[in-house]
Each structure stands twice: as C-alpha cells, then as structure tokens.
C-alpha cells in the first residue's frame, strides 16, 4: 500500500512539474509602415512588425502556448502565418488569407493563440496576404523543454538566427497589384539580404548595412538558417568553415556535414559550426540558385554577405584586412542543390523506429508547374489582344481564393456552395511527357481557374507524387503544406516511374519536412497522415507562383471526438469587409 501511494505521489509530482514547465509566450505585433533607406535609394515606405526588419524573434519551449496580438496600423489588410506550426486544435490561427481567416483590416486586431506541442527547432512567421511577407517576417525558435542540454547534438556555446531575404527598391504591394492587373510577372529582387541587410557587395552599401556575428575561436555555434525570400532558393556558405546540419524544418536530422547549405523559400536548416579558423573576419554569403530550364527573365545574380568576426579580430592589422569570401556555387548548380536536398535522413531517437506510415489509403499524382491563361475580367490592364498571360497550376487547376468567405468558415458551417468545390483531381487530366524538352502538349499549357479542394477522411494516409512539368519551363518548386509535416520517400529527375521509384523508397529514416523543393524537371514522393481536421493550404512558396494559382487546399474532415474536430471560431475572428 505504501509503495502504491508513493508511486501515485511520484506521478502527481511529475505531472505538476510538466505542466509547470509549460509557459505562455505573449507578444504584441504592431504591423505598420515606416521608412528605410537601402542601397543609396531614397527612403522607402515599407510595412513591418514593430518597426523592425526582420521582425521580432519569438522564443518558446516545446509545449508552450504562444499568444500574439496582431494590431494592424498599416493601410493594408493583413494576416500572419506561423510557418511549420502544426496548429493541432487551432486551425483558426494558421493565417493564410481567405483560407483560414478573412484578413485583419486597417485599424483592426486579432489574437493568434496556438500550442507548440511535439515540435522543436527553427520555424518562422510571415504575412500571408499579397506580397507583404517581403518585409513582414521573423523567426520562431522552439527549444527543447529541457533546455540546451536536451539537444540531441553537442550543446552549442551560442545560437545565431540567420534570416535570408530579398529586397526591392519599390513598394511590394504596388508591385504585386500591377503584376495582377497586367498579367506580367513582378520583377526580380534588387538585392538579397541577411538579417535584413544586403552586405558589402552591392553598389553604395553603407557600413551599417552588413550584419555581423561574433564568435570565439573553437566555440561551437548553432546557426538557425531561414529562407524568408519571396522567389529565390539560396546557397549559403561561410568562408573557411564547414557546417553540420542537425535539423531541417524543425525536424532533427542525422548529422550531415557540408560546406554549402541550400535553402528554398519557406525552408529552415539548423547547422552546427565550429569556429576553428584563424582569428579573423570571414564572410557568410547567400547567393541565388536559379533552377529554371530554360532560364527566365534576368534576375539579381548577386551575393548578400554578413561578417563572421572572431573575438580578438578588432586589432588594426586584422580589422583593416578584408574578410575572406567563400567561393560560391554556379548560379545553376542543380547537382549541388539536389545532393543537399536528397542527402539528409531523419534522426531516430530513443530507439524508436520511424513513424512513416506503411499502408496507404489514397494515392495522388499531382503535376506542378507554369502555364498560361486568358486575361481575367478583374485584370483591367491586361492586353487582351496579346498572347495569353502566365498562370500556374496543380493538375491543371489554377487555384483562386474565395472573395467573401474563408474556406475554413465555409467548411465549419458546412456551407461549401459558392465558396469551393470538392473535385480536385487525384491525377492529371492528360498523361504526356511532363518533362520532355520537346513536349508537344500545348493544350495543357492552358489552365482552368477554380477553387477546388481535395477532401480527406480523418486519419487517412496519403501518398502524393509531385511531378514538375516543362510546359513553360522546368523549375524547382518549393511546395509547402500547412498543418502537416510529411515524409520524403524519394526524389529524382525526369518523369516519375512508379516501379523504379518504389525500389528507392526510404521507409526506415526518411527526412521529415513541411516544405520540399521538387527537383527541377523531376519528381518527389511524400507521405503523411491526415490527422489534423481543417482546411490546409498547399502551395508553391514562390510568391510569384502562388499568386498565379500554384496551390490547392486539403480539406480534412472531423474525427470521432470533439478533440479531433474543428472547434468553433474565436470571438475576435476577423470578418470579411
């Protein structure tokens, strides 16, 4: 009896201790306009959070509740998305405009509240309406509940958040609006940035426009690398230093040693770096990876830099010596990109096997790529006598968000009529040579505008082949799924061949991600369990492509209990104007 009560007391203390360790992490994000000068241009009005570029970093521990009060003092409609947060039980906090909520209007506010159970690593947050995420973004760092000593890798001496971005010498909202009205894609960025700063290799860069990171010789540092860029995958290197990747998209990986990290928009990488070089100054460099074949319009083939500065490197003889610059990969180095993307595997912990599901309920074969469409009625400046304008699609369905009701509200009310249809196709409408350079299926270039969703039963296991197409150009598309992580079973080039590919499936320790860079002119196979009820956006993380329709939505039906069902919307959920 004494042993019995002792055991109960121990369990009770453990439960109380566990609850006590969880905290509420609360922030107020004031989204407003302020002016900033970069690259010797006149002051530019940008939209940002709390007058910062990048915005504030949110630090939490696994199991914490995050509460963010969005106060919109900008002149634009606004939403925030918590990229990679699973949002189990909190689908109303996911953030994409007209998918899970109507935008917060100027002068309005909304409180995002969600939990980070079962997630550790680097995620991030960003605006999810128009092109505002070009300047409305920041890091979301989730540490283990047990602190740094609980990392499944050597404890770092310090951590650095490294956010890669893109910069335009223009107002991005006006740029996006003009692209829509004319049907002509928005221009490429004028510069790349590291922590909001372009660095030393742009004309007229000022000394205060280069980010700096302090290290001590032989120290170990955890770099939390985020590609918050709008449209460009980036190579990331540190001169004279090698990196050991230990995580990607807030999922631990087996240690992967490399001298170059490749991050597509939306992705994150956690990498350890030992400061083992001679005392001095070294450049971190972020340079573009252009995967398009044939290459499209000219883009900024430039390099953003930050300075890694060793303690003791302030002495004149060292300070006046220019930092060492790493050799950057060729801009079209697909081999290096593919080697990195396909080289990582999951870290299996505590002797547990991988959670990858082995039985599949639903198979989908989904083409992703560019196409064309006729001018839409709302495109008032579109040249209707010229050739068709650019579009993009998945299985030839070019996604259009609803105008008056968010998808999640229509789903919750069980009133889809007039808002969306449940007929997203499981396969392409026509089978053809998807990646052939001489593809003759010109009719498939024309896409159909629609708001189609794929409806899934609760707990259904889905295997999806993502197939790149060559109709306009082959290109690596970073495909992101809200509300889920997925396992990457295999990836390769050319047209997907089921028999050959299945022999290569990794069902033992496949990497787990929320965003996958589908190989240019190739394919990838992902698998996940639809155990999160709600309406979940799946889209290319090139904003130039999502605005053209390279998206769809997964509608996951309720499970058998209140805990496995979409809860009622919060009282302050914004209304559509």
UniProtKB/Swiss-Prot annotation:
Residues reported in the UniProt entry to bind Cu cation 4: 477, 540, 545
Q: Known InterPro entries for this protein?
A: Cu-oxidase-like_N, Cu-oxidase_2nd, Cu-oxidase_C, Cu-oxidase_fam, Cu_oxidase_Cu_BS, Cupredoxin, CuRO_1_LCC, CuRO_2_LCC
Which sites bind Cu cation 2? 83, 126, 541
So which domain of life are we looking at? Eukaryota
**Annotated EC:** 1.10.3.2
- The region annotated as signal peptide is 1-22
Q: Which residues bind Cu cation 1?
A: 81, 480
Tell me the keywords, alphabetical order.
Apoplast, Copper, Glycoprotein, Lignin degradation, Metal-binding, Oxidoreductase, Repeat, Secreted, Signal
What are the Plastocyanin-like domain coordinates in residue numbering? Answer: 30-147, 158-313, 423-560
| Cofactor(s) annotated in UniProt | Cu cation
Q: Which reaction does it catalyse?
A: 4 hydroquinone + O2 = 4 benzosemiquinone + 2 H2O
Query: Which subcellular locations apply to this protein?
Result: Secreted, Extracellular space, Apoplast
Please give the GO cellular component terms listed in this UniProt entry.
Answer: apoplast
CDD domains xref list: CuRO_1_LCC_plant, CuRO_2_LCC_plant, CuRO_3_LCC_plant
Q: Name one GO molecular function term.
A: hydroquinone:oxygen oxidoreductase activity
Q: Among the record's GO biological process terms, what is one?
A: lignin catabolic process
Residues bound to Cu cation 3: 128, 482, 539
Q: Which PROSITE patterns match?
A: MULTICOPPER_OXIDASE2
Mind telling me which Pfam families this protein's record contains?
Cu-oxidase, Cu-oxidase_2, Cu-oxidase_3
Glycan-modified residues: 33, 109, 169, 203, 208, 218, 332, 383, 396, 404, 441, 459
Stated name of the protein: Laccase-25
Q: Which organism is it from?
A: Oryza sativa subsp. japonica
Q: What is the lineage of its organism?
A: Eukaryota, Viridiplantae, Streptophyta, Embryophyta, Tracheophyta
């Amino acid at each position: 009896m004494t042993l019995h009560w002792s055991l109960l007391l121990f369990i009770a203390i453990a439960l109380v201790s566990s609850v006590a360790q969880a905290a509420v992490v609360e922030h107020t994000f004031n989204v407003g306009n302020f002016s900033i000068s970069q690259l010797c241009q006149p002051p530019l009005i940008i939209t940002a959070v709390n007058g910062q570029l990048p915005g504030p970093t949110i630090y939490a521990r696994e199991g914490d509740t995050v509460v963010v009060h969005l106060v919109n003092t900008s002149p634009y409609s606004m939403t925030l998305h918590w990229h990679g947060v699973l949002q189990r039980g909190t689908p109303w906090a996911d953030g994409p405009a007209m998918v899970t909520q109507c935008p917060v209007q100027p002068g309005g506010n909304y409180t995002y509240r969600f939990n980070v159970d079962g997630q550790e690593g680097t995620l991030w947050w960003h605006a999810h309406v128009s092109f505002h995420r070009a300047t409305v973004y920041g890091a979301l760092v989730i540490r283990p509940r047990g602190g740094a000593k609980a990392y499944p890798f050597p404890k770092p001496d310090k951590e650095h958040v490294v956010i890669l971005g893109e910069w335009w010498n223009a107002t991005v909202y006006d740029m996006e609006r003009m692209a829509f009205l004319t049907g002509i894609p928005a221009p490429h960025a004028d510069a790349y940035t590291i922590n909001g700063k372009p660095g030393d290799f742009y004309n007229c860069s000022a000394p205060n426009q280069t980010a700096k990171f302090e290290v001590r010789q032989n120290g170990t540092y955890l770099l939390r690398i985020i590609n918050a860029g709008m449209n460009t995958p980036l190579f990331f290197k540190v001169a004279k230093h090698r990196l050991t990747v230990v995580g990607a998209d807030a999922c631990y990986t087996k240690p992967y040693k490399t001298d170059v990290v490749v991050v597509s928009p939306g992705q994150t990488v956690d990498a350890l770096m030992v400061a083992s070089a001679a005392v001095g100054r070294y450049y971190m460099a972020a340079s573009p990876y252009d995967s398009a074949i044939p290459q499209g319009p000219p883009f900024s083939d430039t390099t953003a830099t930050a300075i890694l500065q060793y303690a003791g490197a302030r002495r004149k003889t060292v300070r006046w010596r220019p930092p060492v610059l790493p050799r950057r990969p060729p801009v079209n180095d697909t081999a290096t990109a593919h080697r990195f993307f396909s080289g990582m595997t999951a870290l299996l912990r505590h002797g547990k096997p991988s959670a990858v599901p082995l039985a599949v309920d639903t198979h989908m074969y989904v083409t992703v790529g560019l196409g064309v469409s006729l001018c839409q009625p709302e495109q008032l400046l579109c040249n209707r006598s010229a050739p068709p304008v650019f579009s993009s699609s998945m299985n030839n369905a070019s996604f259009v968000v609803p105008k008056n009701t968010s998808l999640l509200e229509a789903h919750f009310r069980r009133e889809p009529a007039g808002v969306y249809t449940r007929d997203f196709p499981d396969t392409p409408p026509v089978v053809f040579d998807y990646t052939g350079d001489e593809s003759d299926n010109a009719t498939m270039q024309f896409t159909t505008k629609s708001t189609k969703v794929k409806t899934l039963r609760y707990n259904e296991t889905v295997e999806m082949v993502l197939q790149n197409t060559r109709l306009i150009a082959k290109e690596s598309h970073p495909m992101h799924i809200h509300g889920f992580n997925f396992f990457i079973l295999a990836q390769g080039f050319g047209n997907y061949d089921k028999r050959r590919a299945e022999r290569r499936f990794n069902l033992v320790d496949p990497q787990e991600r929320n965003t996958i860079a589908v190989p240019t002119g190739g394919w990838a196979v992902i698998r996940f369990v639809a155990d999160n009820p709600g309406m979940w956006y799946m889209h290319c993380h090139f904003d130039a492509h999502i605005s053209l329709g390279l998206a769809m939505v997964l509608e996951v039906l309720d499970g058998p209990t209140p805990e496995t069902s979409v809860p009622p919307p919060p009282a302050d959920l914004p209304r559509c104007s």
